[in-house]
Amino acid sequence: MEDAGGGEETPAPEAPHPPQLAPPEEQGLLFQEETIDLGGDEFGSEENETASEGSSPLADKLNEHMMESVLISDSPNSEGDAGDLGRVRDEAEPGGEGDPGPEPAGTPSPSGEADGDCAPEDAAPSSGGAPRQDAAREVPGSEAARPEQEPPVAEPVPVCTIFSQRAPPASGDGFEPQMVKSPSFGGASEASARTPPQVVQPSPSLSTFFGDTAASHSLASDFFDSFTTSAFISVSNPGAGSPAPASPPPLAVPGTEGRPEPVAMRGPQAAAPPASPEPFAHIQAVFAGSDDPFATALSMSEMDRRNDAWLPGEATRGVLRAVATQQRGAVFVDKENLTMPGLRFDNIQGDAVKDLMLRFLGEKAAAKRQVLNADSVEQSFVGLKQLISCRNWRAAVDLCGRLLTAHGQGYGKSGLLTSHTTDSLQLWFVRLALLVKLGLFQNAEMEFEPFGNLDQPDLYYEYYPHVYPGRRGSMVPFSMRILHAELQQYLGNPQESLDRLHKVKTVCSKILANLEQGLAEDGGMSSVTQEGRQASIRLWRSRLGRVMYSMANCLLLMKDYVLAVEAYHSVIKYYPEQEPQLLSGIGRISLQIGDIKTAEKYFQDVEKVTQKLDGLQGKIMVLMNSAFLHLGQNNFAEAHRFFTEILRMDPRNAVANNNAAVCLLYLGKLKDSLRQLEAMVQQDPRHYLHESVLFNLTTMYELESSRSMQKKQALLEAVAGKEGDSFNTQCLKLA
């Protein structure tokens, strides 16, 4: 969770803490997505995020969960989780694929999203939040150049038509319940298989996908590769958008009884070369305003190679080699070895806030709530980005379903042959990341199932030589692999998550070793420039660090504190600039398990490191650590003094504000505590209407009077005017 006030937070195990840099540009594009998001929750909306926050998002997030540490909570879980879903491409993602960082309560939390190689982050959505780049494709891929002629046997290659088709409007019929985290000091590290519906439960953070600033560091990008596919795709693949390419049908399924149906991949010789200069005209359109469109095209092609690189398994490599070397006939692939996804549920998600308003405030009040839904935006990536940026994640899930249905992968299509494109994979990534963010883990698992281990041959560009000529690598965003691995820990299977993360780490380590030896990512000979090689090394070091971070969070969830601390120390090697935040997180883990002396030692190390840094954030970090140290010793008066000092330096620091109110409560000053929280919410509702703050406030209302319902309903009205349909109403305790 990101506190707009400059608060800090530490990673918490529970959140794929669930999925957008600027030149010099290539390097910038590489690493915003890779920044670690130490806890992906944010107190504020995108309007409150500024570009300046990108430089210290990690420090700001370390305190988020400690903010909730001494909460009065009837639920053991604690974790803030409003985050941005970052852009969905590695190059376009801001700093951090939404990845979690150590949480204040001592629990590092994975934030999502999805090394967010993109938006929402590989989504992919860490801390600054801004839909990373408006790279949403507005030109239908089907409008690309058509070949002059096509053989009589040629059939059109399946093409995503999400830009030209509009799904019929669907009426809302309720919403899927979602579970929210409730702030508590020690609950963040508890590994529970599945929390009962009525318990407030933390949800993974998709940090920084929702801000308007282009420069931000967040792990949401770690979680999500930007869901907006680059318009440059037509350069490396001019015919990708052609509705009727002159290539023979890439997939033919001869029905054979008693055994899996093999899929025939026909040879490239049947393809008729395009005879018109349309692809070149398309390139000119894409690069309008560029001084050197060819240089730009080559640059983007290099970024594609770098970001898409992956090492397939032996079986998959054999199929791809056969496709690449075929001369005549077809390459047969067992149907069971292909990816055949489809929607597993198509019900409209609805709006829980409006349902509560109907129940408690009446139809007249409920009619005043106006939020975007899947019918009120453009049926394309542009509309999807709009819904996500407005925090209408449930509507975004619905729109993803419509776009996938237009692509032939809708409800009831699971198990049927289909072809994949960069668009369809990005849509699946965003949909799955949103489901995880909303706490619908079982739904996400069902829809992830057809993807297997994400290594089927039809998930690689080489499998479609006529659609993506010359392009190599995996269509699967890196952050989608992280999300696939982390999902199991939210379903009560942390060991399975750890095993999957180890496999991803092995591939990342091998690719990095190849690059450092002067080879290409796949181990072959490389003609890449030295500058390009260094950029690739930085990218894969960052990705490897992201995997280590997820492993540390998983170990923390398993309560293996020794290995978790070792893993966090190893992350410092990959992210040395984030050493103060990581050390603070490790210190708070020590606080959570009651090791005060070790915590004090780490906090002293943080103070030494921050002495070399200039600026307000370093001082706030040291003061926050001191406050938490006193909080862990039940010295509430001294802790309140430190929190108050932080507020003098940064009056908008939500973490300090919330914790100061909690300290007042434990000092027996309930009225003062209530006044502080109420003033905070009234001062800036868009910034402070955070689930953890509201949970504390409603709990204090219950302590203050048996007639707390009226005040809770007033909070509901405030929420209705500011929040989207993703808001978890359980924090209002109205049910």
Swiss-Prot record:
InterPro entries per the record? TPR-like_helical_dom_sf, TPR_rpt
Which locations, inside or outside the cell, does it occupy? Answer: Endoplasmic reticulum-Golgi intermediate compartment; Nucleus
Residue stretches of biased makeup (Acidic residues)? 34-50
Q: How is it modified after translation?
A: Phosphorylated as the cells enter mitosis but is dephosphorylated at or before the onset of anaphase. The phosphorylated form recruits CENPE to kinetochores more efficiently than the non-phosphorylated form.
Upon changing residue 717 to Q, the result is: In a breast cancer sample; somatic mutation
Task: Note the SUPFAM superfamilies from the entry.
Answer: TPR-like
Indicate where the modification Phosphoserine is found in the sequence: 109, 184
Q: Which GO terms describe its cellular component?
A: cytoplasm; cytosol; endoplasmic reticulum-Golgi intermediate compartment; Golgi apparatus; kinetochore; nucleoplasm; nucleus; TRAPP complex
Question: What task does this protein carry out?
Answer: Component of the TRAPP complex, which is involved in endoplasmic reticulum to Golgi apparatus trafficking at a very early stage. Also plays a role in chromosome congression, kinetochore assembly and stability and controls the recruitment of CENPE to the kinetochores.
Q: Which disease is it linked to?
A: Encephalopathy, progressive, early-onset, with brain atrophy and spasticity: An autosomal recessive, progressive encephalopathy characterized by central nervous system atrophy and dysfunction, spasticity, microcephaly, global developmental delay, and hearing loss.
Q: How does it assemble?
A: Component of the multisubunit TRAPP (transport protein particle) complex, which includes at least TRAPPC2, TRAPPC2L, TRAPPC3, TRAPPC3L, TRAPPC4, TRAPPC5, TRAPPC8, TRAPPC9, TRAPPC10, TRAPPC11 and TRAPPC12. Interacts with CENPE.
What name does this protein carry? Trafficking protein particle complex subunit 12
